[in-house]
Amino acid sequence: MKFHIIFCLLAALMMTSAFAEVTVEPLRHSNKNPTESECKNACADAYAKGDQSRIPEAHNFRDYYCNCHITVQ
């Protein structure tokens, strides 16, 4: 019985970890000021690719940096 309860809790935790919310803080870099939408796209892209080197600062092709805060829900 204990095993069943632990298994259910673990399964629920794994299901919730599939949903991640990306919040960002744009940072100025190289005379460019990215929008929140551009940062979200850059951060989400880095997160989806599992590129941990680009988190928390996701660098994209337009040469700007964004602070990415990944919160799992």
Swiss-Prot record:
Gene Ontology MF terms in the entry: toxin activity
GO CC annotation, single: extracellular region
Tissues and organs where the protein is expressed, per its UniProt entry: Expressed by the venom gland.
Keyword check for Cell inner membrane: no
Keywords for this protein: Disulfide bond, Secreted, Signal, Toxin
PTM text: Contains 2 disulfide bonds.
Top-level lineage group: Eukaryota
Signal peptide positions on this chain: 1-20
Statement: the UniProt record of this protein carries the keyword DNA repair: no
Protein family according to the UniProt entry: Belongs to the scoloptoxin-15 family.
Protein name per UniProt: U-scoloptoxin(15)-Sa1a
